[in-house]
């Protein structure tokens, strides 16, 4: 039997009933939106609680029939046959409910900023950055998420030395947060005549997109410098200083944006800075909460090698959970769900183990 927090379950069910009652009273639109959002969050949990309660009653009734010596033998035998599948169903439902009741990461529902940078491997690393960006872009398209490139630095023979983009939609960060780290590729470059396999790497950083209410940036904590933005061949693309560099003085974090519009550069640089500062804050809080826990999916350290893409063998291996899939082509086309769901499941298992240990 799975241990479930009965008091909390009752509180959630009561809260759900209160929300239902308040929504039925036709509140103003602002209040209704807030209630509807909380209702949507609670509905799957409360549905599972009610199904589990009904199942528990059904099992109790069957056990009463079985234990009653006055009950017809055939009826008792029938009840005995019905019990095992109900116990199996109950066990499955309890595990699902246990996952639903796990503490929510407040950043999970947020959009994300993804930063991909070439590591070791020169031109091959830049090409690999291009492959990774297209992979995430196709994955995002499958979920109808919006992808917008904030800045890019193209490689000499293709791909990108660096590319930064926003991926907007509900729950983006919950799906992509385990992608942060070093991704390694093993393949034979097109220019390699001897057929020798080269190893290159790229670093991925996935940050929850932060709103102004999430993180405050005080004007006195930043220094904004402007400079001329250069176009192709080093020519100035306009006559004004349009490139923007923002330095966060307390942390030393620096963000540069060099598109044509100075106003847009400033806004986007602040957007990236806000996300990086929020990410630091979240990681510090998580570190304090779980100093004793070592999650199997890894620490989220961006220097940690998390995954290898081996072209000759057509395989992708995630080193954090020792999962190898022989479908490299499909994964690079954006078929990431099997990998991502396995990482989420592993993380949830680690959380449950921690909760059991604390309990």
UniProtKB/Swiss-Prot annotation:
The keyword Membrane does not apply. PROSITE patterns: RF_PROK_I (PS00745). Keywords: Cytoplasm, Methylation, Protein biosynthesis. GO terms for cellular component: cytoplasm. Methylated by PrmC. Methylation increases the termination efficiency of RF1. The keyword Cytoplasm applies. SMART domains: PCRF. Residues 284-311 are annotated as: Disordered. It holds the Pfam family PCRF. Signal peptide: none annotated. GO terms for molecular function: translation release factor activity, codon specific. Its main location: cytoplasm. Belongs to the prokaryotic/mitochondrial release factor family. This is Peptide chain release factor 1. The gene is prfA.
